[in-house]
Amino acid sequence: MTNCEKDEEFVCISCVEEVRYSFVSHLSEALRRKGINNVVVGVDSDDLLFKESQAKIEKAGVSVMVLPGNCDPSDVWLDKFAKVLECQRNNKDQAVVPVLYGDSLLRDQWLSELDFKGLSRIHQSRKECSDSILVEEIVRDVYETHFYVGRIGIYSKLLEIENMVNKQPIGIRCVGIWGMPGIGKTTLAKAVFDQMSSAFDASCFIEDYDKSIHEKGLYCLLEEQLLPGNDATIMKLSSLRDRLNSKRVLVVLDDVRNALVGESFLEGFDWLGPGSLIIITSRDKQVFCLCGINQIYEVQGLNEKEARQLFLLSASIKEDMGEQNLQELSVRVINYANGNPLAINVYGRELKGKKKLSEMETAFLKLKRRPPFKIVDAFKSTYDTLSDNEKNIFLDIACFFQGENVNYVIQLLEGCGFFPHVEIDVLVDKCLVTISENRVWLHKLTQDIGREIINGETVQIERRRRLWEPWSIKYLLEYNEHKANGEPKTTFKRAQGSEEIEGLFLDTSNLRFDLQPSAFKNMLNLRLLKIYCSNPEVHPVINFPTGSLHSLPNELRLLHWENYPLKSLPQNFDPRHLVEINMPYSQLQKLWGGTKNLEMLRTIRLCHSHHLVDIDDLLKAENLEVIDLQGCTRLQNFPAAGRLLRLRDVNLSGCIKIKSVLEIPPNIEKLHLQGTGILALPVSTVKPNHRELVNFLTEIPGLSEASKLERLTSLLESNSSCQDLGKLICLELKDCSCLQSLPNMANLDLNVLDLSGCSSLNSIQGFPRFLKQLYLGGTAIREVPQLPQSLEILNAHGSCLRSLPNMANLEFLKVLDLSGCSELETIQGFPRNLKELYFAGTTLREVPQLPLSLEVLNAHGSDSEKLPMHYKFNNFFDLSQQVVNDFFLKTLTYVKHIPRGYTQELINKAPTFSFSAPSHTNQNATFDLQPGSSVMTRLNHSWRNTLVGFGMLVEVAFPEDYCDATDFGISCVCRWSNKEGRSCRIERNFHCWAPGKVVPKVRKDHTFVFSDVNMRPSTGEGNDPDIWAGLVVFEFFPINQQTKCLNDRFTVTRCGVRVINVATGNTSLENISLVLSLDPVEVSGYEVLRVSYDDLQEMDKVLFLYIASLFNDEDVDFVAPLIAGIDLDVSSGLKVLADVSLISVSSNGEIVMHSLQRQMGKEILHGQSMLLSDCESSMTENLSDVPKKEKKHRESKVKKVVSIPAIDEGDLWTWRKYGQKDILGSRFPRGYYRCAYKFTHGCKATKQVQRSETDSNMLAITYLSEHNHPRPTKRKALADSTRSTSSSICSAITTSASSRVFQNKDEPNKPHLPSSSTPPGNAAVLFKMTDMEEFQDNMEVDNDVVDTRTLALFPEFQHQPEEEYPWSTFFDY
């Protein structure tokens, strides 16, 4: 990993030797789990802190100082800490986190002597909280105050990358991370690397890949990164391949800019081992294409909440600062950066330290005008890779075409001699330009940097290639002749532009000046000229005082001049290169005198030029496509345009003096004639390829020939023309307020009939037989004739309908909109395939049974309160609370379309259901919603084979000013771990209102209910879903129509999940217990198991720990009698553990645990031992204070001490070993046993066993107390039976246990107590380990200290009353 250990990601922990391997080791490990891997621990030994670690402390981003509690005020440690504090004050980027560990009476004294000014927090150990809580507090402080800045917004992106990786087939998987400069590609790649690298055999993170491979070469780079520590240099790439073809390798190539360089590395990456992962980050999409990477993740910017967090942290602004202006400034900065983390961080740091708001305002304005070098350098490095044409197109877009229609931009740039189709794609691939909703967009930073490139070319305004700043342009164009004190005119010479200028866009909103006649004389290469007013409320005042314009550049492609003040363009202007003339509201009477060459002209817009009288000059524009003369009230004639074969759009609306049109081009698509004096069109007007006529005509003969005519709008009288409609497909008579009736149209082939807004229309004789869409909104029709069976959409919104015919036979009807039909009284029935029903604002009191196919119901303002059960409801805004509650409960309690016995195929086809209602209407309903935007649920084991899907309840808080919820939706992410421990996920998007429908203003918070049978984990063996421990996590995110996450103004406040399974009785929907709410966290296999363990009863926890450490892979019949001997219920306990996936029992009766389950058991044991270790010192002190009399009383319990040979069979009593320790001064450890009938009979007998110092073949046994029960006569039989159950296993166990039980790893040759002192069958099994060496590492104890880890394994010993056990015997030496 090259150059990865940045100073700002480096943590130094300084401590004393006493806490290095206890508290500090836990702290460093917790930091690593949080993703902070660069942690260095320095120990104060021989002044090492300042001799060797001082440089590291000064370079570290965070310095954690762990001060011991027993510090004396004169201690050198305090002097060192004071110096570290001073170092921190000199280095503002470094954070110091002091930790006062341990109790001390002197603490208050020396605390007062230290100056903690500037430190955000001091952490102290307290009696009332454990070390684990203290560690958690420190880690949170370190992460949130220093490291969190770089990881804001990373979590959700990590999930998407993980999902992208998991979807790829097993083999060599590749992912590309793509995004604009500063968007967080490297940060995201590092986060992925930190999270995944431990799962690979080899891994490397190569920063600045192009530079690294140029400096070191391919072989050296590969050898250094993938095989560190090699002595021999790899001379051939084939040798490297041979060494890595069996390894799972993670390779991250960061910031690959040269596609060929990346391809040279990856073209043969098939030599990596299966399961390898290659991640490439680049700002150029072509890199991924050439490298053969198809899975590309585009990094999005931070959302509003994340951006605010980052800015406040970077600028050190507190969240609760009350000054409104300061908050407004932060919003402006965040909006300007538009989610770019680099910009937000840089601007935040630039504003940091500014005390006055005015200073911050000024600094921000300067930054906008001149972006910081770090940002400019990041963007300009991409700009420098462009070709000359690509640079010109980028600069044109940055200066002039932000947000313009992409086809419009392409048309203009093509006229300039570029190849924009290809070159704009290059800009998109390099993240300089984006295309959204068919418009060209640049990030605000990109636009400003592009403009800065232009301004940086020269300080002379007249020599800049592109001009857009109004005051600079005014300086060049303003008329400069003035009278001085009534004297003759004096001329003030000014620069008047130069041939370098290629584009000039002047916004005249705030300007008032006179243009000089020769303003454009020197701009010989001007391609783009636009003079406009961005504020429609301002009337610009820019005139020619001399009444003339001498010239315009002949290289113009765009001439856009609003309110042009002259009667014509200069006569010497040659428009042969013009692509567009756009001169609305001009004073033009004609364009020019005579005929000009207009071979490049595509568009001419002279709308509202009230003085225009003649446009005959356009006949030479053979490539003309659009003519817009709307509002030219003096224009009397439209020329014959039959030769303009490319003309497709003509707008003559408002040209009241035009009485006729002689000829219409054959390829016309749109003809707008509203407000003209035209009463009729010639027969030649209507052609077979006409697609739309928009007019106010009274007669259109020859329509029968219009086989492709689709639309005819605003026809005033239909009687005379219906017979000529021929093969008309769509007839629009919208807003024909004079139309009163329509004849029988049964013989027409109409598919669409739109009568919306025909307020006088009160009768229809008959409908076309193939009609599919009928719009009657706003009509006066009270009754309609029989509807055609082909009908798919009926919209009668706001009509006067009182009744409808029976629609049960309309099997194709999908949408029925009766909203606002205030006079509608009854509905006889609904079609069986109806999907959307709207009757908001009706007076219906009762609605017939709704079909099962229904998906959307809008009942806003409806008086109906008797709606039947169905699947998808929306917009219950004003129904009563009781009705809404009934709907919630019905939806969550009955799913009648999934009856018992349904096949999986039919279940997969089952429809979804959903509905919503204002949250205030269901306040009294019981839905078990949890706070937060995510929830973890557990599947009952009995439900898993019948699982169909989930019902999800989500409560969303909308902002008060939210007006239109049409595009609002909710994304649900379902995550679980499969039985192999791998993370899995499913994501579904639910849009809460049907697209295209008008949604009332959302005024209240809403509760949404969704169900989808596809939200179901994959099936494992049989029909059992492949879910580990039955735990599933659901997360909910507000989204828009484009499935992009909305900002934090939309908040998921509560959520819940219910299970839907195949019906087992009268209902098929069961409640499920909500385990916990998390917001949000990543659920690993370990966390799933730990939640299952924490929910167990105490005895089941003990059973799990026994099995995890002793009985893995053993037969149930073998384990059962042994566990029963310690008073545990084996049969029920094993079933409980199996139900929550903590163990599994194989078909041949073996208890099986996965490695993760065993690991968790060991960690739990280790954690309990750490907790107990805190009690040892206090226990020792307490025992040392025990009165001698009490100690003698305990010693008097010793009944006898005997010596027997080590090979002796024993005393035939049943004993259980519960501890062992090394004894100072002795070669042999001592074992501690208690009677096996302690719990069943209350027996207090114990014994201690140790080898003799003089004869190692003899055992010294000390018996304490007596048994209170007869000697068991069946013990040997029981042991024999257990041995016969698995004789081979038992013999192997006995051999292992006899020589290795609790062997101290520091003394491998030291003989230990044999297990024969305990009954062979029981003892052998009791101390059999799956991995004895690993267990010994976790269970080792210091000399003369109780083996508390063993005590943790047997918790019943921890709670034994004091009089039942001679504690003093542990401290005899």
UniProtKB/Swiss-Prot annotation:
It comes from the Eukaryota. Keywords: ATP-binding, DNA-binding, Leucine-rich repeat, Nucleotide-binding, Nucleus, Plant defense, Repeat, Transcription, Transcription regulation. It is found in: Nucleus. Residues 170-421 form the NB-ARC domain. One of its GO terms (molecular function) is DNA-binding transcription factor activity. Disulfide bonds: none annotated. InterPro entries: Apaf_helical, Disease_R_plants, Leu-rich_rpt_3, LRR_dom_sf, NB-ARC, P-loop_NTPase, TIR_dom, Toll_tir_struct_dom_sf. Transcription factor. Interacts specifically with the W box (5'-(T)TGAC[CT]-3'), a frequently occurring elicitor-responsive cis-acting element. Also acts as a disease resistance protein involved in resistance to fungal and bacterial pathogens, including R.solanacearum, P.syringae pv. tomato and C.higginsianum. In presence of RPS4, elicites an EDS1-dependent hypersensitive response. Interacts with PopP2, a R.solanacearum type III effector. This is Disease resistance protein RRS1. It comes from Arabidopsis thaliana (Mouse-ear cress).
